[in-house]
């Protein structure tokens, strides 16, 4: 079977398993060449299979600390109808490379929102793994089941200050389109907060603390985004922004309790605009990111996920310097993105963008390549003309 990238309504339907393997290896290779850092030895990542979560796992394992890791993610393998999800293979191949290095890489393919999953992870920590030094919450999910009430909540990417129409990029057709987004209802805002806010992160921390699974002075981090005013209406001032504000509010509560009980700390890291499975489908964001990529690459300050996370650990969290937070207690890894010279140039290009010239004025080529890489396509060193053995792939277990 030969696997090619097939688009369905702007999504890439299939994945290339060995392209995913190459992408994991590329990130590992970057970490091996980076300056490195001394950091946590035992790490739990919820949302570990792609984007910032995967980069976090790779960084702590191969970027210096040689950490043992637990990853929680909800993914599917090969079936008669589909070859599986990218995260499924990212988990498999991360584990392969970690084991070669003598590291524990335990995967839980479970619903992170469920109490049963939390119980399984905690039991493993207490029985086999040992107390964790770092807990990273990097979950991006479309739905959440509240196992206490049985209610199922669905997140929506909507505005809250009236309807919105803005340009976005259709990577299937390589063109700019206008995307209309309606204003959210009170119920939709609350459901999005339930799914993408800090409630589940807080529940994880409460359970881990109650069961004595944190080491002394342990750290927990959740990832967020603020971005440019160009994306405010759909992001920071939209349903997602309300959820992220909740995440930041929960960080303060978690931090107070961890600090009091174990001398630990909790905070949100505000990261830069990058192509991830979550961000690629936010209206306006793809065009903004493509322009930003061009500007930051020209200034030699562009970072992809693994570069950003490696810098976060080596220069901010586990450096010899005291961590600098903003006035709301957040770590600002979007510092380079929001530099005045960067944003001024982004604004200049944005004002001149048209459907005819956007490929020339932005780094659309680089943006699309990263988008394709998410599912294992368009990577150097992968033979995409080679038949894949589906039966062999079915035998692979994360």
Swiss-Prot record:
Applied biotechnology uses: Used in the biosynthesis of medium-chain volatile alcohols as biofuels engineered by microorganisms. The switch from the native flavin-dependent enoyl-CoA reductase used in the production of n-butanol, a key second-generation biofuel, to a flavin-independent trans-enoyl-CoA reductase from C.acetobutylicum leads to an order of magnitude increase in product yield in engineered E.coli.
UniProt EC number: 1.3.1.44
Keywords associated with the record: Fatty acid biosynthesis, Fatty acid metabolism, Lipid biosynthesis, Lipid metabolism, NAD, Oxidoreductase
Pfam families according to UniProt: Eno-Rase_FAD_bd (PF07055), Eno-Rase_NADH_b (PF12242), Enoyl_reductase (PF12241)
Effect of residue 235 to F: Loss of reductase activity
GO annotation terms (biological process): fatty acid biosynthetic process
Active site: residue positions: 235 (proton donor)
Pathway recorded for this protein: Lipid metabolism; fatty acid biosynthesis
Molecular function as annotated in GO: enoyl-[acyl-carrier-protein] reductase (NADH) activity; NAD binding; trans-2-enoyl-CoA reductase (NADH) activity
Highest taxon of the lineage: Bacteria
Impact noted for substituting residue 11 to K: Slight decrease of catalytic efficiency and 3-fold increase of the affinity for NADH compared to wild-type
InterPro entries, per the entry: Eno_Rdtase_FAD-bd_dom, Enoyl-CoA_Rdtase_cat_dom, FabV-like_NADH_b, NAD(P)-bd_dom_sf, Trans-2-enoyl-CoA_reductase
SUPFAM superfamilies: NAD(P)-binding Rossmann-fold domains
Job description of the protein: Involved in the fatty acid synthesis (FAS II). Catalyzes the reduction of the carbon-carbon double bond of crotonyl-CoA to yield butyryl-CoA.
Subunit architecture: Monomer.
Family to which this protein belongs: Belongs to the TER reductase family.
Note: Possesses high activity for the reduction reaction, but no activity for the reverse oxidation reaction.
Official protein name in the record: Trans-2-enoyl-CoA reductase [NADH]
Organism: Clostridium acetobutylicum (strain ATCC 824 / DSM 792 / JCM 1419 / IAM 19013 / LMG 5710 / NBRC 13948 / NRRL B-527 / VKM B-1787 / 2291 / W)
């Amino acid at each position: 079977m030969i696997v090619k990238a097939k688009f369905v309504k702007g999504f890439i339907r299939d994945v290339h398993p060995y392209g995913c393997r190459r992408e994991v290896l590329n990130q590992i290779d970057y970490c091996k060449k980076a300056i490195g850092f001394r950091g946590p030895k035992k790490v739990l990542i919820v949302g570990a299979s792609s984007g910032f979560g995967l980069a976090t796992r790779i960084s702590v394992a191969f970027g210096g600390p040689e950490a043992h890791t637990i990853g929680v993610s909800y993914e599917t393998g090969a079936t008669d109808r589909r070859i599986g999800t990218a995260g499924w293979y990212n988990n498999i191949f991360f584990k392969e490379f970690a084991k070669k290095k003598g590291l524990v890489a335990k995967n839980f393919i479970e619903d992170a929102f469920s109490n049963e999953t939390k119980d399984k992870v905690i039991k493993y920590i207490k029985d086999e793994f040992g107390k964790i030094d770092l807990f990273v919450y990097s979950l991006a999910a479309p739905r959440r089941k509240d196992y206490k009430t049985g209610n199922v909540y669905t997140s929506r990417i909507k505005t809250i200050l009236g309807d919105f129409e803005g340009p976005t990029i259709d990577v299937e057709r390589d063109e700019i389109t206008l995307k209309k987004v309606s204003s959210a209802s009170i119920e939709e805002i609350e459901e999005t907060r339930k799914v993408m806010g800090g409630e589940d992160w807080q529940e994880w921390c409460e359970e881990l603390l109650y069961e004595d699974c944190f080491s002394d002075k342990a750290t927990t981090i959740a990832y967020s985004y603020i971005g440019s005013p160009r994306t405010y209406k759909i992001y920071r001032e939209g349903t997602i922004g309300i959820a992220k504000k909740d995440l930041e509010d929960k960080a303060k509560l978690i931090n107070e309790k961890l600090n009091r009980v174990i001398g630990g700390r909790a905070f949100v890291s505000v990261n830069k605009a990058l192509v991830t499975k979550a961000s690629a489908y936010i209206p306006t964001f793809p065009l903004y990111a493509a322009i930003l990529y061009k500007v930051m690459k020209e200034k030699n300050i562009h970072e992809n996920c693994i570069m950003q996370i490696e810098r976060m650990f080596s220069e901010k969290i586990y450096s010899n310097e005291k961590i600098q937070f903003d006035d709301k207690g957040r770590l600002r890894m979007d510092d380079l993105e929001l530099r005045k010279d960067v944003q001024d140039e982004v604004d200049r290009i944005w004002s001149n963008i048209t459907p005819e010239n956007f490929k020339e004025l932005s780094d659309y080529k680089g943006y699309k390549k990263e988008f394709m890489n998410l599912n294992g396509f368009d990577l150097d060193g992968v033979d995409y003309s080679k038949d894949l053995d589906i039966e062999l792939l079915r035998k692979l277990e994360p």
